[in-house]
């Protein structure tokens, strides 16, 4: 299973669980309207806030590169959700075929060297927002999203790590008493998200199943 297929599969499961099966028709199980493009738009606006663009305050602030990664991953959740929705209502391809189609479209996914001109990065984000509302085409938009990731220094491998890390850690927490208040968040002096990042860094291309198992091993030692 490719990394793209893994992420699409995890997102489908997450949406089925949180929104209810049939969410592709535009409503949650509670009857709330879903608008993934609006989600993308608002997350993209938060991405812009990672830059010290304001001329009236915090003018000496630095670009928050760590938050840029976080926001790009959040946008990816919503891009995949829109991809899955449109696919279900139109082509209804199996996820494996959908993943191949996206991989063929986006090509090589290495990150570029980050430029000093962060205003150019902001403009690139705004160009992505424009595509949401002008001449929107799903595969082309997905390709543009990955072009933005490249410009902002986020590689596909790093995106994959961050995505499955967030997804699997949330599942792990729920499985181990997070809602009930019995979950232990600090493991031998380290927060669980730090342990998760260390596990991800120790093995390139780790699968969700491997990550969950390693988390269980570390948790049992806490």
Regions found by a protein language model. Give the residues of each.
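Flexible "arm" and connector segments at domain edges
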Residues: 1-222
